[in-house]
Swiss-Prot record:
<keyword id="KW-0408">Iron</keyword>
<dbReference type="GO" id="GO:0016020">
    <property type="term" value="C:membrane"/>
</dbReference>
<dbReference type="GO" id="GO:0005506">
    <property type="term" value="F:iron ion binding"/>
</dbReference>
<dbReference type="Pfam" id="PF00067">
    <property type="entry name" value="p450"/>
</dbReference>
<keyword id="KW-0349">Heme</keyword>
<comment type="function">
    <text>Together with an NADPH cytochrome P450 the enzyme system catalyzes the terminal hydroxylation as the first step in the assimilation of alkanes and fatty acids.</text>
</comment>
<dbReference type="InterPro" id="IPR036396">
    <property type="entry name" value="Cyt_P450_sf"/>
</dbReference>
<dbReference type="InterPro" id="IPR001128">
    <property type="entry name" value="Cyt_P450"/>
</dbReference>
<dbReference type="InterPro" id="IPR017972">
    <property type="entry name" value="Cyt_P450_CS"/>
</dbReference>
<dbReference type="GO" id="GO:0016712">
    <property type="term" value="F:oxidoreductase activity, acting on paired donors, with incorporation or reduction of molecular oxygen, reduced flavin or flavoprotein as one donor, and incorporation of one atom of oxygen"/>
</dbReference>
<keyword id="KW-0472">Membrane</keyword>
<keyword id="KW-1133">Transmembrane helix</keyword>
<feature type="transmembrane region" description="Helical">
    <location>
        <begin position="17"/>
        <end position="34"/>
    </location>
</feature>
<feature type="binding site" description="axial binding residue">
    <location>
        <position position="471"/>
    </location>
    <ligand>
        <name>heme</name>
    </ligand>
</feature>
<keyword id="KW-0560">Oxidoreductase</keyword>
<dbReference type="InterPro" id="IPR002402">
    <property type="entry name" value="Cyt_P450_E_grp-II"/>
</dbReference>
<protein>
    <recommendedName>
        <fullName>Cytochrome P450 52A3-A</fullName>
        <ecNumber>1.14.14.-</ecNumber>
    </recommendedName>
</protein>
Length: 523
């Protein structure tokens, strides 16, 4: 067949739109690949090992992630993926055409969060979270984030977080709920989530939703505020959907069911009620409210009168202030119920400092005196090590950049990270690395925090993130958790775990908690 005849037969197909589109796509991706290779060579970088189970466009891996997350095993799944590469701390995978570097190396995490902070951003997080949280400190990048942080930082000054006395009325109701189940098996986590939504709404709005109140206590929940009665449940459901949107990455828009939209509306309704109340208050009423005790919203109103800014920032802080503390308390009590020796040792420390039972000196528990409880601090450190509030996080490269380690077969070369690529980092796994925590890294042992090896961990211990975006409310959460555990130690001598699964299945929404609840008995 003559060459002219071949050209004559093939030419019509070459001019078809789909052929042109295919050729353009191939050319585009080939040019990107060649460009990346050039920069890898220029910057003396090497690719990390490719995750062999990712499959075509990462779709099989994404399906696996959805399955294990539903089963409460996502954190442990990401942990075990590194078992395939025992000498490496990073690997590469893909989601569609998106390149993803997965790392547990403290040096890489430090680069992403601190030393190369301006090379990375939240990426699509704003789109993922926007339906519930809007434009707040956890969803914004750049100038918007800087303005949010400047606005919120004063609200977490020492005098605010030191005011533990406001917690006591809520602790009393929590204790009554526990005593209702004396000698019985009950879900303590469910009570902690109700407790922290009560304390968080009082701190933020100036009035608690009192979700711990119920008919069993003879204290019916008040129903005088629109949306109060179903706020906590709606907030939980909305966060579940936000997490699904996050793990769906570029397919987040597929998660937008009616239930999600309805729950968002319920949450917004309550927040808007409090915002409007604050905005309609006179200057004198605002000052009077502030004198009665610190109220986050009324302090914020002194800085801005924009109702959307107020609503969005309140809900952003609600996520952190409520869920991280509830998760920390739940995991701490889960381990304490499993380890009676640790519980007894903790109670001995509380007895020395504040007394127990009928001899409890509750008035002596303060921000300052809680600092004396070194073993309590070690228990919380160990809880946050094994169960960090945000076990897995990610950032997106805003420009072509590098990570210091993880490339090549030995994992010691820099990694080239093209603009638009994601870096996923697992603090959950980093906190279990034996080179930092020893052979018993998977065991709950508070005593490790009195050993020299844990005094120079640096970026290998990161319970509250790090760098410019380090958690503003970390001391607030630690103070609240310390107070609650100290009070429970005063009131309950014996704890017994009723959970048979260990390690526990973990539910990861925006933060982490027990997938099935924390079932114990207490007396």
């Amino acid at each position: 067949m003559a060459i002219e005849q071949i050209i004559e037969e093939v030419l019509p197909y070459l001019t078809k739109w789909y052929t042109i589109l295919f050729g353009a796509a191939v050319t585009y991706f080939l040019s990107i690949a060649l460009r990346n290779k050039f920069y890898e060579y220029k910057l003396k970088c090497e690719n990390p090992v490719y995750f062999e189970d990712a499959g075509l466009f990462g779709i099989p891996a994404l399906i696996d992630i959805i399955k294990v997350r539903k089963a409460g095993q996502l954190a442990d799944y990401t942990d075990t993926t590194f078992d395939k590469y025992p000498n490496l701390s990073s690997y590469m995978t893909v989601a569609g055409v998106l390149k993803i570097v997965f790392t547990v190396d403290p040096e890489n995490i430090k680069a992403v969060l601190a030393t190369q902070f301006n090379d990375f951003a939240l990426g699509a997080r704003h789109a993922h979270f926007d339906p519930l949280l809007g434009d707040g400190i956890f969803t914004l990048d750049g100038e918007g984030w800087k303005l949010s942080r400047a606005m919120l930082r004063p609200q977490f000054a020492r005098e605010q977080i030191a005011h533990v006395k406001a917690l006591e009325p809520h602790v009393q109701i929590l204790a009554k709920q526990i005593k209702l189940n004396k000698g019985k098996t009950f879900d303590l986590q469910e009570l902690f989530f109700r407790f922290t939504v009560d304390t968080a709404t009082e701190f933020l709005f100036g009035e608690s939703v009192h979700s711990l109140y119920d008919e069993k206590l003879g204290i019916p929940a008040p129903n005088d505020i629109p949306g109060r009665e179903n706020f906590a449940e709606a907030f939980n459901t909305s966060q579940h959907y936000l997490a699904t949107r996050t793990y769906s990455q570029i397919f987040y828009w597929l998660t937008n069911p009616k239930e999600f939209r309805d729950c968002n509306a319920k949450v917004h309704k309550l927040a808007q009620y409090f915002v409007n109340t604050a905005l309609n208050a006179t200057e004198k009423e605002v000052e009077e409210k502030s004198k009665g005790g610190y109220v986050f919203l009324y302090e914020l109103v002194k800085q801005t009168r924009d109702p959307k800014v107020l609503q969005d920032q309140l809900l952003n802080i609600m996520v952190a202030g409520r869920d991280t503390t509830a998760g920390l308390l739940s995991f701490a009590m889960f381990e304490l119920a499993r380890n009676p020796k640790i519980w007894n040792k903790l109670r001995e420390e509380v007895e020395v400092n504040f007394g127990l039972g009928d001899e409890a000196r509750v008035d002596e528990i303060s921000f300052e005196t809680l600092k004396k409880c070194e073993y309590l601090k070690a228990v919380l450190n160990e809880t946050l090590r094994m169960y960090p509030s945000v076990p897995i996080n990610f950032r997106t490269a805003t420009r072509d950049t590098t990570l210091p380690r993880g490339g090549g077969k030995d994992g010691n070369s820099p990694i080239f990270v093209p603009k638009g690529s994601s870096v996923v980092y697992s603090v959950y796994k980093t906190h279990r690395l034996k080179q930092f925590y020893g052979e018993d890294a998977y065991e709950f042992r508070p005593e490790r925090w009195f050993e020299p090896s844990t005094r120079k961990l640096g970026w290998a211990y990161l319970p509250f993130n790090g760098g410019p975006r380090i958690c503003l409310g970390q001391q607030f959460a630690l103070t609240e958790a310390s107070y609650v555990i100290a009070r429970l130690a005063q009131m309950f001598e014996h704890l017994e775990s009723k959970d048979e699964t260990y390690p526990p299945n973990k539910c990861i929404h925006l933060t982490m908690n027990h997938n099935e609840g924390v079932f114990i008995s207490a007396k």
